[in-house]
Amino acid sequence: YNHKGEKRKPKFDIKNFKKFKDKIIYLLINEKIPGMYKIDSLDNDDQKNGSHIMNALKRENFQRNCIVRGLNDATDEDWIIISDLDEIPNLKNSDLKNIKSPIVFFKQLMMYYKFNLILENYTWIGSKACRKKDLKSPQWLRNIKDRAYSWWRLDTLFSETK
């Protein structure tokens, strides 16, 4: 399904990645997503647009959380990296085996759709990682904040992602 919920043919073909076929765990998620908003023909444009946006977010979160289905062979000490397709952390200088912190934030270059469109001297937190034993859900890890918030920020007082 695409972000609009329209059925489409899968675009991934393992034959295009023969070199990595032993490293790729491909999951085709083809089930109904719970809690989707119904879009009624009597809804006004704002209601329809709002429902489309919320449904796209629900689809994305559901798909991301399905990642755990591919982690059956991972040990509790294995690191799980959650990122979008265009967020590729550079692990060349990272030795995850020696990191004691339960969560790792990867500073990444800000690129706009292509590798040659880089915002110079600007990094941002894209990918995040934790050990399998610490992973509550992939979406939980995605939502974790990379900074501490002041005590007076009531919106973060009871948050599990601060």
Task: Give the predicted meaning of each segment.
Residues H3-I82, L91:
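Active-site-proximal specificity loops/subdomain of glycosyltransferases
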